[in-house]
Amino acid sequence: MTNPLWFDPNLCLIGGEWKMPVSGQTLPLVNPSDGSEICQIARGGQTDIDAAVRAARSACDGDWGRMTALERGRILTRLGQLVLDRVDDLAQLEAMDVGKPLTQARADAVALARYCEFYGGAADKVMGETIPYLDGYTVYTLREPHGVTGHIVPWNYPMQIIGRSVGAALAMGNACLLKPAEEACLTALAFAHLAIQAGLPLGALNVVPGLGAEAGAALSAHPGVDHISFTGSVATGALVQQAAGRNVVPVTLELGGKSPQLVFEDADLDAALPYLVNAGIQNAGQTCSASSRILVQRGVYDAVKSRMATAYQELTVGPAVQDLRVGPLISTRQKEIVTGFLHQGSDLAIAAEGQIAAGAPESGAYVRPTLFSDVPPDHALARDEIFGPVQVLIPFDTEEQALTIANSTEYGLVASVWTRDGGRQMRLAKGLRSGQVFINNYGAGGGVELPFGGVGKSGHGREKGFEALYGFSQLKTVAAYHG
């Protein structure tokens, strides 16, 4: 793959200006497909975060803060078109940066454009309401921006998460400070270039790359930030919330998951199979909403196991540019984590494994997709988030048992139910402790319009859909006495 960079990657965007971090320091960005260095990126720190917060506040008090919702929406709509115009360039950046197969990376770029379109159209559709009250009063509510919003974005889906987080915040009139992951920040920088081209006022979007322990920690604890959105690990999310809490700053957290799919004996197995497998191996399993637990009723357990095993045996892992179904993990460190979990499964039966492509660089972060069978629900592989292409098959006998197993982890992000029984569909939709429940599908095609978020250690707050616009705004009540 030729280097698709069309911009200088080692700069921060602060107040509409691209500049080196104050320290002058940079960090290497590594291609997980072969371990080579792509480029150097800025190593922003406390001073850069301070400057970006001031720039964002100035935007809130200036042209951006005075702009109408209609005008904001038009900018986002233009931005969506600019993203579509460069969708192949963005896909190449993401494939090189994250190791994501080109087809999946391109789908993420299209999703980013869709977020811009959706929130561009929704910007002037968020309304207050009038409230009947005492005689002589007129009471109504207003939706207003928080002000300066911080966005700490992970490495697994940079474009999609920027779209659902930054896109919604901009639609509501907030000025954003984006801290992309140090492992994958190229599409975040590209997005910022396109946002300027779309006409976004200076300071409305600021981008400070850097280490989480430096730039991320400074952003989380900054007293000038009015709201923080974080997507990432449970441990880091807890630290972000703790730091923000000292300034009484609200936080939206989208954290880990151990999402189950429940397959009943009356399920359409032909329809279910692609979802059962793909939900576990997409993006090499590095997805918060990955379905790593497949719960199967005993009457169809052997059939599901056989079909999934066949599908796994056909999986090949290779460099992003080869555009296979599975690419590398993000880093050798992540490979070590996933390999450690595979070792913990040495007491389990392996139903099937995928293969690593011949000629794949040994320096790439590759692991074989692995399907374990007959896994006890309390086993570490059935309980802990792995964040790799690993799935476990768990048999069950009754609906009640399936629900108990599904709800037995600390997480609650996504769940899926495969059954033709309408009553069972409704019972489980209510009974599953999960932010999203899908019936006879998984993920509903990505669903820009569908509110997304978790319960338990999967986090709190909602992004995507109109619900995100409420989260990135605050409600003001006005009570006017006129006699």
List where the protein language model places each region.
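Rossmann-like NAD(P) dinucleotide-binding subdomain of oxidoreductase/dehydrogenase enzymes
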Residues: 128-271, 323, 396
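Structural signal for hydrophobic packing residues in well-ordered secondary-structure cores
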Residues: 60, 64, 80-87, 91, ...
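Residue-level signal for inorganic ion chemistry
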Residues: 35, 72, 94, 116, ...
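ALDH superfamily catalytic-core signature
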Residues: 227, 235-376, 439
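Conserved C-terminal structural/oligomerization subdomain of aldehyde/semialdehyde dehydrogenase
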Residues: 36-39, 225, 262, 316, ...
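Terminal low-complexity tails and localization/encapsulation signals of metabolic enzymes
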Residues: 1-41, 74-78, 126-152, 252, ...
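A structural signal for short, well-ordered beta-strand elements
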Residues: 28, 42, 65, 98, ...
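Glycine-rich loop-to-alpha-helix module at the N-terminal edge of alpha/beta enzyme cores
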Residues: 36-126
